[in-house]
């Protein structure tokens, strides 16, 4: 039963991460798995589950605060290209994404579809 609960939790973490950020699902899954594993280990060793939950919540608040302080706005076409290139692992894809975003604007929608034609 615990394995199924853990699997559902990790699945939900990955889905939520993908919905909110669109990236980072592997990192979120690894972190969730570590939290579950260490949480169960600590509870088995006698830790108070509610105290453990409160500690995790405080840690999440602190990490979120630290990340928000170090976050930088991505505003220029070059910054968008660089960010997209890192995410895609390919500079040419980063440039294409930046060009598409430049054309549609911040509120625009970009649709990506599979094609059998090379280069399109």
Curated annotation (Swiss-Prot):
Highest taxon of the lineage: Bacteria
Keyword Plastid: no
Effect of substituting residue 85 to G: In strain: 1373
Result after altering residue 73 to D: In strain: 1373
Subcellular localization, as worded in the UniProt entry: Cytoplasm
Gene Ontology MF annotations: ATP binding; ATP-dependent protein folding chaperone; isomerase activity
SUPFAM superfamilies, per database record: GroEL equatorial domain-like
GO CC terms, sorted: cytoplasm
GO biological process, any: protein refolding
InterPro entries referenced in this protein's UniProt entry, alphabetically: Cpn60/GroEL, Cpn60/GroEL/TCP-1, GROEL-like_equatorial_sf, TCP-1-like_intermed_sf
Segments forming a coiled coil: none
UniProt entry keywords in alphabetical sequence: ATP-binding, Chaperone, Cytoplasm, Isomerase, Nucleotide-binding, Stress response
Catalyzed reactions: ATP + H2O + a folded polypeptide = ADP + phosphate + an unfolded polypeptide
The enzyme's E.C. designation: 5.6.1.7
Effect of residue 78 to E: In strain: 1373
Main location: cytoplasm
Residues binding ATP: 23-27
Keyword match Cytoplasm: yes
UniProt subunit comment: Forms a cylinder of 14 subunits composed of two heptameric rings stacked back-to-back. Interacts with the co-chaperonin GroES.
Family: Belongs to the chaperonin (HSP60) family.
Name of the protein this chain belongs to: Chaperonin GroEL
Biological source species: Mycobacterium intracellulare
């Amino acid at each position: 039963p615990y394995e199924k609960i853990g699997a559902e939790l990790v699945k939900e973490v990955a889905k939520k991460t993908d919905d909110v950020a669109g990236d980072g699902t592997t990192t979120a899954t690894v972190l969730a798995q570590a939290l579950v594993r260490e949480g169960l280990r600590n509870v088995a060793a006698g830790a108070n589950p509610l105290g453990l939950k409160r500690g995790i919540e405080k840690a999440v608040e602190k990490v979120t605060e630290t990340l928000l302080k170090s976050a930088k706005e991505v505003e220029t076409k070059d910054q968008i290209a660089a960010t997209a290139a890192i995410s895609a692992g390919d500079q040419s894809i980063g440039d294409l994404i930046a060009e598409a975003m430049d054309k549609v604007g911040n509120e625009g929608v970009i649709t990506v579809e599979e094609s059998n034609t090379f280069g399109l």
